[in-house]
Curated annotation (Swiss-Prot):
This is Probable glycine dehydrogenase (decarboxylating) subunit 1. The lineage of its organism: Bacteria, Pseudomonadati, Pseudomonadota, Gammaproteobacteria, Thiotrichales. It comes from the Bacteria. CDD domains: GDC-P. It catalyses: N(6)-[(R)-lipoyl]-L-lysyl-[glycine-cleavage complex H protein] + glycine + H(+) = N(6)-[(R)-S(8)-aminomethyldihydrolipoyl]-L-lysyl-[glycine-cleavage complex H protein] + CO2. The glycine cleavage system catalyzes the degradation of glycine. The P protein binds the alpha-amino group of glycine through its pyridoxal phosphate cofactor; CO(2) is released and the remaining methylamine moiety is then transferred to the lipoamide cofactor of the H protein. Gene3D superfamilies: Aspartate Aminotransferase, domain 1, Type I PLP-dependent aspartate aminotransferase-like (Major domain). Disulfide bonds: none annotated. It comes from Francisella tularensis subsp. holarctica (strain FTNF002-00 / FTA). One of its GO terms (biological process) is nucleoside metabolic process. The glycine cleavage system is composed of four proteins: P, T, L and H. In this organism, the P 'protein' is a heterodimer of two subunits. It is an enzyme of class 1 (oxidoreductase).
Amino acid sequence: MSFIPHKLEQIKKMLDTIGASSVDQLFDEIPRHLRADTLNIKDGINEIQLANLMRKRANKNHHNINYIGAGAYSHHIPAAIWDIVARGEFYTAYTPYQAEASQGGLQVIYEFQTMMAGLTGMDASNASMYDGATALAESVLMAIRSNKKAKSQKVLIAEALHPTYLRVLETITKHQGIEFDIVNLDSKNGKTDVTKLEDFANTNYAAVVIQSPNFLGQLADVDGITNWAHKHGALVIAVTNPMSLAILKSPAEWGDNGADIVCGEGQPIGVPLASGGPYFGFMTCKMAHVRQMPGRIVGKTVDLDGNEGFCLTLQAREQHIRRAKATSNICTNQGLMVTAATIYMSLLGAEGLERVASISHENTQTLATELAKINGVSIRFNSAFFNEVVIDLPVNAETFVTEMEKEAIDAGYFLGEYHSDLANSIMVCATEIHTSEDIKEYIEATKKVLARIGG
């Protein structure tokens, strides 16, 4: 019995309509060597036999210890979180337009907004964006709309911004007349030299983007850059790891007046690694800019009987109300991921988040210190970091990473793809899930691999 709902004639008609010659052509962007022509399953096997076959194949997967980081982080997620998220009341992609039928979901989003505003020190938060990269792109568009005093649509970006974020930012803003200037990082400390900003002092910018911790794991001179930006009439967009804010000062405390908009990737707070997603982006801002904020915003109100309730608010900003004048064409939020993050933050509390962040930093410090004791291995930058650090190796880093996989360790992020000067460098990340025994195994594996490949 075939479970495919379409007949061959129907498939041909659909392909003709879109101008494709075959179903395979719909997937031609996938390289041929990655495609499977068959599932290699015998004909006529029953469901029990099929399940046993799949289990045997699944057992061939190797679960390496992960030290990669670079924007997606391995944190422990208590079992209770996704048990609650998977309940039918939450397990939906529905956007809660009908407040009278959605009070539970709306309250979760409201609690999320409250927590994110508190974590970042801002006045308001939206209900989330697609991911960290799109949250940054929307933040740039928001800043340009909001900065009425700016005489240009130029944005200044510190070079150590996550490269994927920069590519997404350029893609989304490509046809909107927005220009970007890049401030080169200091090769000695892996972050922006504030004195270099004076080279851009004669250019009018609508916004300045600061990532801290930056892509290389270093803590930026957020006070100096923020004050410089405000002095020159630019809004400050902070890109940050929410977990780091449990032990670092909030963007609201950067410089004399704080950042204006804060965004980033929410994956570290309750969302598992899953081949790139789904994750969620967060965005918070000062109240002065809230009417230019994209996405859903949930507010708390009272009904005619004086009962407390929740509803979507400031909806005139959104495309389902005023399409031509909407702040964005984003038409949903990552509600399920937001639910997980809300439960995660509620379950851990402020002290729990601080403990996770502190242990992550301490484990990274220990790993880096022990690696630097190995002959030929060193810490590249002599500056403060959170839970990622760049390590210089005496061998090609890509080869090292490949060899470490044979030791069941994902050793770190190969930085040669990011910058040609870093071909012998990797970025390593440790979190609270890495034990002292794990770190010892990493050190011993490093010695073994370097001896094997000639380091």
